[in-house]
Structures are given as C-alpha cells and as structure tokens.
C-alpha cells in the first residue's frame, strides 16, 4: 500500500519514466530565469534521490519541517518529494509575505530549514531571529546545511498519517491558521481526481494540466500535482495568470485540462473575440467562482466546460464536491451534488435543517467509520479552533449554500460576507458579480457599513477602468453603476455607497481579503472619493414589475 507522496511518485516514475512530469513554458522560464522544457519522471526521480541522500546526510528526518519559498518552480516539487521521503513536512511560503508575516510563520511552524530564492534569505533569517528560532537557509541548488536540531520523530516509521505539509490559510481574516496535512490528504486528493470520471475523467498517461494557481495553496499542490502523479500526467505550472498571453500558453503547452480561479473567466471575456477563441484540445476547466452571467457565454465562446467545484484547505478531498455530470446547471453557482462517500448538512442560524431552496451553512464530513478521512489533521497549536470547526461531529465550513429540489448544491456566499440590511441577507459575492458587468468597473469588492436605521448598508469599492476626472464625473459614474445594479438586483442589494479606489486588498490567489475590507469600509462614507447613493435605492412601485 502506498503510504507517502514520495512513494506514489516513485511508483509512477517506475512505470512512466520516459513521460514528462513537468513542462516549463518559455514565458515562465523567462520570468524565473530558468531553463524551459520538459522534465521526465525518470530525470525527476534521479534528482529527487540525490536531494534525499543529501538531506539525510545533513541530519534531516521525520518530524522536521522545512519551508519552501520557491514559487511555482520545478525545484518546489523536487525538494518536496525528497523531503517527504525522509518524513520532513514542507511548509510552502507565499513569496508575497513580508516581515511580520514571515516572523509569525517562522515562529509558529518551527521550521528548521528554509529552501528559498536567494533574494529572500536575509528576510527569512531576520524573521526567524525575531521569532527566537534557529533557522538554516539554503538556495535550491545548495548542499543542505546541517540540521539545527535532531529529527523529533527519528526512528518512527513513516505512514499515510505522517505530516506531509503545513499549509497556511489565506488569512482573509485574522492570523492564518496552519493546516496539518498528512500524506493521506494528498494521496486521497489525487486519487479522488483520478477516479471521479464524468466530464472530469482523466486519461492515464495522456493529460497535460495547466495551472496558474500558486503551489502555496491546496488546489495546485494537492489536486493538480497529485492527480498528475497518480495518473502519469504532465503538470504545466505557470508563474502566474497572464491574461494577454493566456491562450498562447494554452496552445503552446498542448494542455488538455485547465485550472482556473473565478476572476479569470471574467478577465478573459473582456478581450475582443478572435477566430482563435475555440480551444478544441481543452477537455475541461476545473475551478470555482465563475461569474454566473459569464458561465454559459464563456463555454460557448471557448468551447469547453468550466466544472465548478467546492472544497477547502481543511476538507481536501475528504468532502470535495464537483459538478462533473450533467445537468450542471450552468450559470447558477451550482457545484453539483455530493458523492456517496461525502455527507452534507445545510443548517440555519438556529442549527435547524434548512428547507429545500433555503440558504444555510454547509456542514460536511466523510462517510464511513472515520468522518475526518481525507481532511486536514487539525490546526497547528490550536486544538480549540479545531474542535470548534468540528462541533457536533461535522466540519463547519462557514459557506452559505442552498440545495435545490433536484439535489444540486448552489453556492451563495461565505457566512461572514453576508450583509444584513433591514432583515434581508445580501451576498457580497452576488452583488460583486453584477457590478463586474458594468463597463466602468475593472474590479470591485462589496462590504457592509453601519447604518443607524437598517443595521447594514451596502458599500461597493470600485476600481474604475478609467478614474473619473472630477467630482461630477465621479457622481455620474456612481449613479450609472447603481442604476445598473437596480436593473439586475432587488433594490436593497444595490450599493448605498460607491467608493472609487486605486486597488483592492487581495490575497495571492486574487481573492478579496475580506478582513481588510471589513476594516476599511466603515471609514469610507463621507470621504472625497465615496459617493452616497442611498437616495437611489427605492422600493419599486407595486405595479412596476407586472
């Protein structure tokens, strides 16, 4: 039985040695200043064994943790698998982290080693010193320095329950939590993807999966990487999403599968149509959060399905759900229905089962004897948060969904993103989706601001396509945006305030940092670049929609 990620890789390398495991496109190679081309399983296996032996000689072993600040480079995979063979857990480090964040990570994770790009060595060493930790730092091509302390679990056998990685949540609110992910988490994620079939069926030894998503998050690291390892496929990691060259990269890479974030289809659809839009080689896209109004038009224009899925870092594939069978309910934020090995409850704020069509919090667990099978093993140094998340034997996701009469699940919003105005629950994501269709809007984030009468009012932070020239132009732009939303949404969902900003607080995966938005929003009304549009929000006359 395969017990570790390294063993899974070695098994595939023995069968598919001549096949490529990685493809680095020239654009990515130029961004990273590395060599473009393909790396075979056999060549990767040789490099990994060399690294494994070097790490072992330097004293690294079971129970150590090693940070990887390597972006989406091939070195990430080679060092990950080599360290995994010894029982060393890897801690992917977001390259955008700075002093305070690195100090927290170094202290909280207790990494013994950081394999990092040379330009970040000083930052990491300074962060570790402030955290009171002894840390070794090396470049990916260096010989490993001696371990600063003995392996904590030296002599203990490796298993599928051995910690494989420590992934930190994106930290959209509060301090990031360290999710302990065992080997089983990654093996189950790749195995799930390899077997789900339907529109997401992976053909052994034939798929070429392109992803611009960062390896510091589970989508690329657990689903994409492990699915390719377990099926003998080729992963094509990009340094990031480049809208202008995206389709050139798709064609040049000979990709058959794409992974996407919800923001990507919206950006790609803004480009002028061309005769090259149809992508016959692409079998499907895997992702989440595509704009409802763009879902069907995107598929018609580019010629492949976008399969919406739901999962979290904490759930892994222990409770993943995907719309990989028809009917997919395109354009409704549907992510399909659960398989037999996943159990789902949807509950109201009172903890009662939600009725069909009624929004409620999604609770999940794995079916069978172990409800946590395939999930994370817990939050590092935070048993209370782990227990709270698993209250009542169900994992509380914090996502608001609803189940339709045919069993399909539809995403509404994150629980903490819901705006409550005059007793009405308003989804920030829903409002953002509509506002993004306005030609003046380049990017938008919606948040609540206090209202003495209604409890909350809706505020939209808009990054305009072109900054308004003066106060009058700003007021007119705000009026146009609100009138558009009034034509698309119930009146109470339209923005009561429109603030024009230069940029939005985003995570590295281009998700809105809701914690920062929550803190930022209340201070915007009354400022020069925020237009009060509350007077435009009027309930339609009774006969207006008849």
Tell me what each language-model feature is.
Residues 57-60, 151-161, 166-211, 231-233:
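Conserved adenylate-forming
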Residues 22-73, 77-81, 98-103, 184:
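Conserved AMP-binding/adenylate-forming core of the ANL superfamily
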Residues 25-37, 119-161, 170, 175-176, ...:
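ANL superfamily adenylate-forming
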Residues 97, 364-372, 377-378, 385-388, ...:
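AMP-binding/adenylate-forming catalytic core of the ANL superfamily
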Residues 187-208, 216-256:
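Conserved AMP-binding/adenylation subdomain of ANL enzymes
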Residues 489-511, 531-539, 543:
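AMP-binding/adenylate-forming catalytic domain of the ANL superfamily
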Residues 7-10, 57-58, 81, 85-146, ...:
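Structural core segment of the AMP-binding/adenylate-forming
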Residues 230, 255-260, 269-329, 343, ...:
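Gly/Ser/Thr-rich phosphate-binding loop
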């Amino acid at each position: 039985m395969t017990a570790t990620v390294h063993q899974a890789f070695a098994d595939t390398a023995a069968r598919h040695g001549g096949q490529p495991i990685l493809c680095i496109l020239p654009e990515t190679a130029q961004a990273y200043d590395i060599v473009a081309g393909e790396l075979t399983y056999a060549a990767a296996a040789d490099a990994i064994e060399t690294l494994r032996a070097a790490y072992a000689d330097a004293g690294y072993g079971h129970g150590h943790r090693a940070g990887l600040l390597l972006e989406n480079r091939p070195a990430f995979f080679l060092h990950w698998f080599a360290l995994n063979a010894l029982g060393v857990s890897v801690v992917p480090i977001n390259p955008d982290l700075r002093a305070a964040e690195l100090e927290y990570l170094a202290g909280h994770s207790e990494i013994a080693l950081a394999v990092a790009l040379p330009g970040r060595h000083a930052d990491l060493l300074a962060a570790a010193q402030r955290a009171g930790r002894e840390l070794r730092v090396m470049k990916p091509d260096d010989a490993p320095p001696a371990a600063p302390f003995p392996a904590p679990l030296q002599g203990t056998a490796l298993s599928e329950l051995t910690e494989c990685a420590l992934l930190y949540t994106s930290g959209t609110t509060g301090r990031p939590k360290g999710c302990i992910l065992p080997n089983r988490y990654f093996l189950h994620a790749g195995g799930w993807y390899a077997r789900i079939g339907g529109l997401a069926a992976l053909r052994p030894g034939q798929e070429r999966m392109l992803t611009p998503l960062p390896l510091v998050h589970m989508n690329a690291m657990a689903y994409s990487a492990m699915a390719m390892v377990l099926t003998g496929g080729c992963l094509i990691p990009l340094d990031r999403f480049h809208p202008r060259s995206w389709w050139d990269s798709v064609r040049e890479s000979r990709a058959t599968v794409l992974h996407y974030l919800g923001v990507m289809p919206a950006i790609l659809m803004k480009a002028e149509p061309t005769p090259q839009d149809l992508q016959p080689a692409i079998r499907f896209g895997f992702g989440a959060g595509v704009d409802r109004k763009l879902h069907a038009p995107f598929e018609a224009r580019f010629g492949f399905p976008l399969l919406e899925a739901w999962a979290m870092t904490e759930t892994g594939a222990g409770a993943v759900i995907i719309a990989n069978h028809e009917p997919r309910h395109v354009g409704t934020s549907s992510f399909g229905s659960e398989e037999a090995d996943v159990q789902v409850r949807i509950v109201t704020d009172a903890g009662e089962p939600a009725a069909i069509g009624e929004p409620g919090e999604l609770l999940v667990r794995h079916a069978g004897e172990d409800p946590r099978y395939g999930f994370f093993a817990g939050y590092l140094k935070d048993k209370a948060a782990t227990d709270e998340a698993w209250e009542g034997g169900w994992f509380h996701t914090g996502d608001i969904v609803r189940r339709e009469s045919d069993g399909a699940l539809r995403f509404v919003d994150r629980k903490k993103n819901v705006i409550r105005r005059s007793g009405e629950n308003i989804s920030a994501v829903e409002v953002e989706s509509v506002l993004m269709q306005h030609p003046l809007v380049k990017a938008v984030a919606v948040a609540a601001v206090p209202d003495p009468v209604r409890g909350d009012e809706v505020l939209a932070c808009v990054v305009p396509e072109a900054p308004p020239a003066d106060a009058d132009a700003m007021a007119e732009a705000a009026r146009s945006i609100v009138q558009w939303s009034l034509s698309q949404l119930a009146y109470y969902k339209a923005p009561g305030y429109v603030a024009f900003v230069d940029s939005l607080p985003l995570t590295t995966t281009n998700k809105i940092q809701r914690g920062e938005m929550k803190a930022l929003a209340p201070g915007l009304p009354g400022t020069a670049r925020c237009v009060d549009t509350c007077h435009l929000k009027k309930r339609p006359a009774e006969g207006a929609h008849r």
